[in-house]
Regions:
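Bacterial N-terminal signal peptides that target proteins for export
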Residues: 1-9
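C-terminal motif of bacterial Sec signal peptides marking the signal peptidase cleavage site
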Residues: 18-21
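Bacterial signal peptide processing site
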Residues: 23-25
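Low-complexity intrinsically disordered segments
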Residues: 27, 40, 44-46, 443, ...
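A surface/extracellular/periplasmic glyco- and lipid-processing/surface-interacting theme
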Residues: 29-90, 97-380
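Sec/Tat-exported extracytoplasmic proteins
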Residues: 95, 129-130, 141, 154, ...
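Extended amphipathic alpha-helical heptad-repeat regions
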Residues: 374-481
Length: 481
């Protein structure tokens, strides 16, 4: 039976909510009569007891009676670079809303966290990777599905929306450098302990191994067929991982191809193991949050520059990932850090993997859609319609802006021409007149080009004004003071 620090909840309700001396007496002997005291033998320092890290399988520390910590990180524009990503034992990523993937960093030892952030809102998809480990979920605010899941299980999280600065801190220098406020909140191991203490909860407790770790055969260079992986979550969000033969690790890159580094340590983010878990996807009842079938599917596993197809199962939200090799035997995972992508394969998502010579690998077919999912054809048609509507809006805005600027440009030309008439041989005035004329020509061309778009594109229907009863999507909250 799986043991959680939190209380269990009803399985049926959970399924619905998912759609802590005595001194010796003196003698009469004189110093001369007293026998010399025996020299005290030095006491050997106790040897630190090492235990296996439940998230990496490495025997490199003391993890007994320590709960892992699962911190949700912000990933939207302006959140990078993030603190603590290279120090994490595991990174889990998957799209929960919109087109940008959500990210969770897992740490086996809370005391190893020097700083992690910017801390983002909790998401139920990510929680399903954390709860089986008896991990402490750490986030700032959370959506309704994450809240329902935690409430059903009576599982205590650490939410900055409630606990505030007891467990979270603000980096003023980061904001002074131009970062938005929500991208400046972070936490540390000490702050996490403080926050848990305020709830009467604890970072001590049982932990569960993430995978079945063990020794794997070394991959010969000629068998390295999976060295460059690109996981596309959307047109605006893709993850690249490239195998480094020197280190034996998969190094994570930013979308622009630059190395992904830790804002705290400056270290390259890299992993021994890379997983892409296929999961059928659809849309939840709010119309925009992603729904995944997390009971199982197929996937790919990368290690040592090679890849293989795997299968995975998961009993429920608190059930661990069970991985099997293609032949049906339990998968042995190499000890080390892991990157886990949960990938729906729906419209706009893709997956490419190449060998060192650039040869593209034939990967398993993408997962099927859930009933609430949108087919590729329907999604493409909707995207085309949206793109056309946006093109019309952009063209109209360009015409309006250019027209507004034209009067000022014509006035500037008149002033430049008047100055030149008074001093016709002045080279600077000639240049100023020519620049003013060029600006007018540019604006007129902009108007003409966008008028052509407006005349050929269908005019989008006007969106009715929202009624008073309409609910707006809640804004993400900053930690409570």
């Amino acid at each position: 039976m799986r043991k959680l620090q939190a209380l269990g909840g009803a399985a049926v309700l959970l399924a619905a909510l998912l759609l802590g001396g005595c001194s010796q007496e003196a003698t009469d002997a004189t110093p001369e009569q007293a026998a010399p005291a025996a020299a005290a033998e030095p006491t050997a320092a106790p040897t630190p007891t090492l235990s296996v890290n439940p998230l990496t399988g490495l025997n490199d520390g003391n993890y007994a009676n320590k709960r892992p910590v699962a911190v949700t990180l912000r990933t939207l524009y302006g959140a990078q670079p993030q603190w603590g990503v290279a120090a994490a034992d595991v990174l889990v990523e998957g799209v929960t809303e919109g087109g940008t993937a959500s990210l969770m960093a897992l740490y086996a030892d809370v005391d190893s966290i020097s700083r992690v952030g910017p801390v983002g809102p909790g998401r139920d998809l990510l929680l399903q990777a954390a709860l089986p480990l008896n991990a402490v979920p750490v986030h700032i605010d959370k959506n309704i599905y994450a809240a329902n899941l935690l409430n059903t299980l009576a599982y205590q999280d650490l939410d900055g929306y409630h606990v505030g600065k007891t467990a979270f801190a603000f980096d003023q220098s980061r904001q002074d450098a131009g970062y938005r406020e929500e991208n400046c909140w972070y936490t540390t191991g000490e702050l996490i302990r403080n926050g848990l203490q305020s709830y009467g909860a604890s970072a001590e407790g049982e932990n569960t191994p993430l995978f079945r770790f063990g020794t794997r055969p070394e991959v010969a260079p000629e068998n390295r067929n999976g060295t460059n992986l690109t996981v596309t979550f959307s047109k605006s969000d893709s993850e690249q991982l490239n195998y480094n033969e020197g280190t034996g690790l998969y190094e994570k890159l930013n979308a622009d191809g630059s190395p992904m580094t830790d804002a705290e340590s400056g270290q390259q983010v890299a992993f021994t193991n890379v997983f892409v878990l296929y999961a059928s996807s659809g849309i939840k009842d709010d119309g925009y949050t992603r729904q995944y079938d997390m009971t199982g599917g197929i996937g790919i596993y990368l290690n040592g520059g090679a890849w293989e197809q795997i299968s995975w199962t998961k009993e429920d939200a608190t059930g661990p990932f069970t991985l099997t090799a293609a032949d049906g035997t339990p998968l042995t995972v190499a000890p080390g850090k892991s990157f886990i992508a949960i990938w729906g394969g729906y419209y706009g998502q893709s997956l490419t993997l190449t060998a060192p010579d650039g040869t593209a690998q034939t990967l398993p077919e993408k997962p099927t859609l859930l009933e609430s999912g949108i087919s590729d054809e329907a999604a493409a048609a909707a995207e085309a319609e949206l793109s056309a509507a946006q093109q019309y809006v952009d063209a109209q805005a360009a015409v309006d802006n250019a027209t507004a600027d034209l009067a000022e440009a014509e006035s500037a030309l008149a002033d430049a021409q008047a100055a030149l008439d008074a001093d016709s041989e002045n080279a600077d005035l000639i240049a100023a007149r020519d620049a003013a004329q060029a600006r007018i020509d540019e604006l007129n061309q902009t108007i003409a080009d966008n008028q052509a778009i407006l005349s050929s594109a269908p005019q989008p229907e006007e969106t009715p004004a929202p009624t008073e009863a309409a609910e707006a999507a809640p804004e993400e909250a900053a930690p409570a003071e």
